[in-house]
Amino acid sequence: LSVTTYAMAFLYFIPSYILYYSSIKSISKQTEIREEIIDRAKHNKQDQAIIPDYYFPPVLHAGPSLDTFNSEAMSRYYGIDLKITAPGFFDYSRAFNFKPLNINAKICNNVYIKSLWIYKQQMGIKTFVIFEFNKNPADSLDENTAMFISFKTKDGKIINADVDKKTFQIDGRWLSGRAINGIDSNELESITSGTWDVRTGARTNENITEIIK
């Protein structure tokens, strides 16, 4: 084979395979979480199991593609009524399979960010941050109040990490996440979190929490 052929394989087919394998691995972990929820609900003789929909990580190109078919007709297969909820825009399996940074950063009153995960989803894909809250912030904040989150790095850089106050409940845990470029958990010094008034833009609560690894 020519040098050009080898170069094409390296630049296209190998990265494509790595991305596809990574996506399959993520889906497998999500399946384990869903089935654990279902098994527990059946063991407890519940009428319904609430499971998150799949989050499908992107692959390099349209084909091969992951089978995104997901129907509540699966209830017949599992023998229990299934309610499938939105998964968010992050790989929630990370929050069940990897050690978090425990931070206990206050948003307001009795609402806290308990912990967070920072991960690079796949080669060439943005870094993601997942936050776990002790409760759904939306239940404690009125329509005129939003929350803010930012990181401060050891060299003084401020990185915006805002997420919506409406979080995703997965197996009794309140999670939210977003993509953030250029963030490294080893370089983080503190997290600033709190609330602000959407009418005036003024901060109504601000808290700084040191990040200790």
List the predicted regions and their residue ranges:
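Intrinsically disordered, polar/acidic, low-complexity terminal segments
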Residues: 6-9, 13-212
